[in-house]
Curated annotation (Swiss-Prot):
It comes from Eremothecium gossypii (strain ATCC 10895 / CBS 109.51 / FGSC 9923 / NRRL Y-1056). One of its GO terms (cellular component) is nucleus. It comes from the Eukaryota. SMART domains: NAC. It is found in: Cytoplasm; Nucleus. Transmembrane segments: none annotated. Pfam families: NAC (PF01849). The gene is EGD1. GO terms for molecular function: unfolded protein binding. Part of the nascent polypeptide-associated complex (NAC), consisting of EGD2 and EGD1. NAC associates with ribosomes via EGD1. This is Nascent polypeptide-associated complex subunit beta. Residues 14-41, 125-161 are annotated as: Disordered. InterPro entries: BTF3, NAC_A/B_dom_sf, Nas_poly-pep-assoc_cplx_dom. Residues 37-102 form the NAC-A/B domain.
Length: 161
């Protein structure tokens, strides 16, 4: 069988570029979930050491922040290790205002909690309403308090020493 030298040269040229095993393909970049899964497995191992128990039938969780906003977990997983005073909440939090959650929270609370919550809400509303009104007035008073009164014949050097 005769071998065509042109075809042979062409094939050799192609094989020089492609090396043995075919064309080289770039690998897809791994996403950040691999490290997140690694962190989760470490966390699960630590919780296993603490003998944490999974709490079932927890539908939602709310964490109240100092600034009046609430971290709301709609679908939440909870693990508790009471002997170590440790609770773990899994889920995606949504930051909401207290007024948004009032209708859904009130049926779940007892009478004492409702009273405390209404007092907290009124305090927050009063603080928010009073803050813009007093900002300008307090700034003016502060400037007046920082400036000492000048009295003829007295110097302030004696007070410093």
């Amino acid at each position: 069988m005769p071998i065509d030298q042109e075809k042979l040269a062409k094939l050799q040229k192609l094989s020089a570029n492609n090396k043995v095993g075919g064309t080289r393909r770039k690998l897809a970049k791994k996403s950040g979930t691999a490290s997140a899964n690694k962190d989760d497995s470490k966390l699960q191992a630590q919780l296993a050491k603490l003998k944490a128990v999974t709490m079932d039938q927890v539908e939602e969780a709310n964490f109240f922040k100092d600034d009046g906003s609430v971290l709301h977990f709609n679908k939440v997983g909870v693990q508790v290790a009471p002997q170590h005073n440790t609770s773990v909440f899994y889920g995606i939090p949504q930051e909401k205002s207290l007024q948004d959650l009032f209708p859904s929270i009130i049926p779940q609370l007892g009478s004492e909690s409702i009273d405390a919550l209404t007092q907290l809400a009124t305090q927050l509303q009063n603080a928010q309403a009073a803050a813009p009104a007093t900002e300008g007035h307090e700034a003016g008073e502060k400037k007046d308090n920082d400036i000492p009164e000048l009295i003829e014949g007295q110097s302030f050097d004696a007070d410093v020493e």
